[in-house]
């Protein structure tokens, strides 16, 4: 999941860079090719709209980062709770002299993905 988040963040950074480049190219084209043309007003409007889009994009990136941080915190909390629960179960089994049963293949398969998210 973290790899996907990192990939999305890189995509957002590239899109931001692309928007900067497009704005620069548009400004350059307007200045060099149409310094006093009647269409200049429309080009300026386009540049203003591009700036507004960039601002909205940056706000979206900020919200995305906040969601990403919250998602990581939630995942850590869930993993910690699961670890604590598993430890408590093992302690209860020892205290009550219950036989510790080995996990079935299905249970082992279910715990493998969880292990990758749990701290050592």
From Swiss-Prot:
Q: How does it assemble?
A: Component of the SKA complex, composed of SKA1, SKA2 and SKA3. The SKA complex is a homodimer organized around a central W-shaped coiled-coil structure, formed by the interacting domains of SKA1, SKA2, and SKA3, each end of the 'W' is extended further by the C-terminal microtubule-binding domains of SKA1 and SKA3; the complex forms extended structures on microtubules. May interact with NR3C1; the relevance of such interaction remains unclear in vivo. Interacts with the MIS12 complex subunit DSN1.
Localization: Cytoplasm, Cytoskeleton, Spindle; Chromosome, Centromere, Kinetochore; Cytoplasm, Cytoskeleton, Microtubule organizing center, Centrosome
Q: Which family does it belong to?
A: Belongs to the SKA2 family.
Matching entries from InterPro entries are given as: Ska2, Ska2_N
- Any single Gene Ontology cellular-component annotation: spindle microtubule
What role does this protein play? Component of the SKA complex, a microtubule plus end-binding complex of the outer kinetochore that stabilizes spindle microtubule-kinetochore attachments, promotes alignment of chromosomes at the mitotic spindle equator (chromosome congression) and assists suppression of the spindle assembly checkpoint. Kinetochores, consisting of a centromere-associated inner segment and a microtubule-contacting outer segment, play a crucial role in chromosome segregation by mediating the physical connection between centromeric DNA and spindle microtubules.
Checking Pfam families in the record gives: SKA2
Gene Ontology biological process terms in this record: attachment of mitotic spindle microtubules to kinetochore; cell division; establishment of meiotic spindle orientation; mitotic metaphase chromosome alignment; mitotic sister chromatid segregation; regulation of microtubule polymerization or depolymerization; spindle assembly involved in female meiosis
Any one GO molecular-function label of the UniProt entry = microtubule binding
Record gene name: Ska2
Keywords, sorted A to Z: Cell cycle, Cell division, Centromere, Chromosome, Cytoplasm, Cytoskeleton, Kinetochore, Microtubule, Mitosis
Q: Say which domain of life the source belongs to.
A: Eukaryota
Entry protein name: SKA complex subunit 2
């Amino acid at each position: 999941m973290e790899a996907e988040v990192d990939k999305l963040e890189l995509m957002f950074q590239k899109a931001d860079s692309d928007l900067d480049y497009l704005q620069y190219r548009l400004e350059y084209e307007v200045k060099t090719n149409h310094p006093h043309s009647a269409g200049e007003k429309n080009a300026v409007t386009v540049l203003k709209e591009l700036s507004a889009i960039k601002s909205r994009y940056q706000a979206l990136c900020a919200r995305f980062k906040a969601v990403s941080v919250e998602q990581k915190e939630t995942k850590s909390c869930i993993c910690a709770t699961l670890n604590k629960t598993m430890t408590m179960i093992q302690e209860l089994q020892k205290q009550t002299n219950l036989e510790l049963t080995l996990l079935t293949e299905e249970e082992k398969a279910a715990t493998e993905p969880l292990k990758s998210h749990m701290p050592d």
